[in-house]
Amino acid sequence: MGSLKNTWLRRIFRWHSWLGLLTGVPLLLLGLSGSVLVFKPELDHWLAPRVAPPPAGRAPVPLDSLYRMVGHRYPAIKKMAIVGFPQRPGECYEFRIYGNDGNPHTYDLAGVWVDPYAGRVVQEGANTGLAGGALNWLLQFHFCFQLGMGGVLLTALLGLALLASVATGAVVYRKQLGKVLLLRAPLRTHSWRLLASDLHRYVGTWALLLNALICFTGFWMNLFGFDPAAWRAQCQPAPPNQLMARPVDALLATARAAYPELVPTRIRLPTHPGTPFEIDGVVPGHALPWGPGAAVQVDPTTGRVLTVRRAWQAAWPAQWEALMAPLHFGTFGGWPVRVLYVVVGLTPGLLALTGFALWYRRRAGAARA
């Protein structure tokens, strides 16, 4: 029995080693980009283009006019949304464009910044380049490595691989987990091999549960990469726009009257019939842990309120989906939690480096023997 157990432990150790070697570089890139994206809202605001403040007494351009201007500028897209709102003079609306050129190996998102008083485009560009916003480029890289649906599938598989690496690592170091967590395992610094081994064990143990949570939620959000229907949809170019007849400002007023406590974080603007006008946002007192788990939908043809959504009152499948993004990016617990996510996001890179050092040392020792 002992021999069989040792055989299985050696096999699990080899799996752990090869998982780390094969996925180390992409997981390093995902960890680094994810650590930056934890503070994407603040960085977006800091990096966003600015315009001259408007003259005193000048009224902003109606949102409906901006919607139609952007819709004619991008005449064949799946949808658009407003994801950034001016809070002070000189700030712009940020529109997000959801295009589809029929190529499943590209992801056709773009950013458009619009002066709310002059009604002109200040900056625009696809998320495959920096003109679409440096953080938008980084988010798309984190999401799919800028490789379209193939990248979505790859990042989902990497999430599974990291989960397997966490599980096999927990088995390999199972007898030392308690000592490491209680700080009873010394950090040996008298040789680089021992230091690498101890760092690998310490970092992997302390980040184990949060790394498992992050990689599982990332896998779950990219699960559609396994769906053939999603691939087929990406092969269908977006048809020409059919913009809403009813003014955006009227729909916005209806939505706000139906859900006055909702603080908008995104306004989804249909470009084709059959898609509702929707405001997503947060409700004070219910922001944690749901993130933007509240929404109101309005029929753009009739102006009738369709749904008012509160994730904390929904059935568990809807609650589950609403939790995924906040748990993945650490947006559910304020600054201390977000800083913790930044630190843990750096650990896959450190684990990859220390793991490679240990593998290389063993390989070199075997060659000398």
Model-found features: residue ranges?
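Conserved histidines in hydrophobic membrane contexts and catalytic metal-binding motifs
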Residues: 1-369
